[in-house]
Each structure stands twice: as structure tokens, then as C-alpha cells.
Amino acid sequence: EPRKRLDFVRDVITSLPEEVAQDIHMLHIGSEVKLSDEQLVAALQHAEALLFPSISEGFGYPPAEAMAAGCPVIAANLPAHNEVIPERCLLPATDVMAWVDEVVKVHAAWKRAGGVPRNPDDSLIEHVTASLSPEAQGKAMAKAFDNACE
């Protein structure tokens, strides 16, 4: 599906240094690969990163799920994404080399850590919860209504 921008991911992967590209094993979870909740968490905890280059859809749950599982997220810097995804995880949507550089950095950190499963990152869970909890959504709606009535 074009809005997922898998062609962009292919451009990033084919632009990686060979020694990094040889270590990369892509898993496209979604329409073709269905996982239970437990399998999804395990896959994310064993993944080097979640790449989320989409530029034409609203907020996506995969980054929130990945962050909750402790998986690093690399996402396109767009308004729908930057409401929840921390700035350090956002890259220019069309800059292949910025994505290549970030994948190389994440891969190096993964290798230094011995490729062990990741643990949930409490700071990212708190970040997502603060953005997506019913209380946070209620405050955002109240603010939007207040602004609309001014």
C-alpha cells in the first residue's frame, strides 16, 4: 500500500553499508503477517527497531506498541506522529540518508548490547500514557473546545 511507503524503507535498506545490511532481517507485520498480542510484544522486544515512514495516515498504533515494548522507533516527523512519538525518534520524512544514519546507530547499539531482548522502557510508556490516556484526551478535547469558542 503506497501510504505505508515500503518503497522508502527499501531505499533506506539498500543504502545501508553492506556489513549492516547483511545483518538486517525485515519483518513486515500487518496484512500478510498476523501475530497475537503476545507474539507482537515478543517480536518488538527482539527487534532492532520499528521503522514507521508513513506520511499519509493519522496516528498509528505500531509506534506506541513498539515504544511500550522497549523497541526503538524511527518515524517520519509529521504532525500526526509528533503528538505522541518523542522528538528524538523523528526524522525528516523524505531524507533517506538521515534514516540510514539512524538505522546504523541503532544497529551499532543493538550489537554492543549483544542483541538481547529489550525490556519495556518505562519513560516511553509514561510518555505514551500521558498522551493517550482518557484523562489526556479529555484535556486535549477541552482545550480544543475552549480555543474554538474564543
Cite the ranges covered by each PLM segment.
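Conserved catalytic-core segment of nucleotide-activated headgroup transferases in glycan assembly
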Residues: 1-34
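Short alpha-helical segment that forms part of, or immediately flanks, the ligand-binding pocket
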Residues: 41, 64-68, 79-83
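Short alpha-helical donor nucleotide-sugar binding micro-motif in glycosyltransferases
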Residues: 42-47
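Aromatic "clamp/platform" in nucleotide-sugar-dependent glycosyltransferases that forms part
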Residues: 55
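Short hydrophobic beta-strand element within catalytic cores of glycosyltransferases
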Residues: 72-75
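Conserved acidic donor-binding segment of nucleotide-sugar-dependent glycosyltransferases
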Residues: 89-97, 104-114
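A charged, aromatic-enriched C-terminal amphipathic alpha-helix characteristic of glycosyltransferases
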Residues: 114-149
